[in-house]
Regions:
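Non-catalytic DNA-recognition/assembly elements of restriction-modification systems
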Residues: 1-20, 154-187
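Structured loops at beta-to-helix junctions and adjacent beta-edge loops in soluble globular domains
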Residues: 11, 37-40, 108, 156
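A generic structural signal for short beta-strands and their flanking turns/coil linkers
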Residues: 33, 51, 99-101
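A short beta-sheet element
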Residues: 38-39, 57-125, 137
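A short glycine-rich beta-alpha junction/loop motif
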Residues: 95-103, 134-165
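Well-ordered mid-protein domain cores that form the structural environment of catalytic cofactors
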Residues: 121, 130-131, 154
Length: 187
């Protein structure tokens, strides 16, 4: 199997940082609307639904590229570094607003978003992702979107990516099922 070494910039069609913190103030939150992501939603490989705060559709519209959609990949650049998830096609919402501590990418036709996320959960992927981390004060990735785009990764053919993702998804779903069973037993 032949892998091609490509920069992230060659694998994505869009990258966008979260809004400035002052763009989402406490008074912007409402009881229902467009969910705003936080670190607890970025635990694991797939976006975790729940524990959302919401903004109105108008507020989300005003935040433009800080809106993430199904198929997008969301990465934490400040706080709990190393978090990276994809938003599945069957997510509960059509769109989400990323926080000021996150950025999002839209993959192009050369890579599956699931493959990209699984890659960055490997030891080498985490090393590459965290290589520009600053530990002074709040942990952060220096120039997050710029440095992320310069990372080089090994990319197989799309056919092989599909095979890898299919196998890893089977394991991920089995683990989720087992965890749900364990949670029910503990209750």
């Amino acid at each position: 199997m032949k892998f091609e070494t490509l920069k992230i910039a060659d694998l994505i069609s869009e990258i966008s940082m979260g809004p400035f913190g002052s763009n989402i103030k406490v008074e912007c939150f409402v009881d229902d609307g467009i969910p705003v992501l936080n670190g607890s939603n970025l635990d694991g490989f797939v976006l975790k639904e729940g524990s959302f705060r919401y903004v109105t559709e108008e507020k989300a519209d005003s935040l433009g590229k800080a809106n993430a959609h199904r198929g997008d990949v969301v990465i934490t650049h400040r706080g709990t570094l190393g978090q990276i998830v994809f938003i599945p096609q069957d997510s509960n919402y059509d769109r989400y607003v990323i926080s000021q501590s996150q950025f999002r990418v839209k993959c192009n036709e050369k890579i599956l978003p699931e493959y990209l996320v699984y890659y960055f959960h490997t030891r080498i992927g985490q090393h590459k992702l965290l290589s520009n981390a600053s530990q002074v004060g709040v942990p952060a990735l220096a120039r997050a979107s710029t440095t992320f785009q310069k990372i080089e990764i090994e990319v197989p053919t799309l056919e092989y990516q599909h095979k890898i993702v299919d196998i890893l998804e089977l394991f991920r779903k089995k683990i989720e099922t087992n965890n749900a069973i364990n949670d029910n037993l503990a209750a």
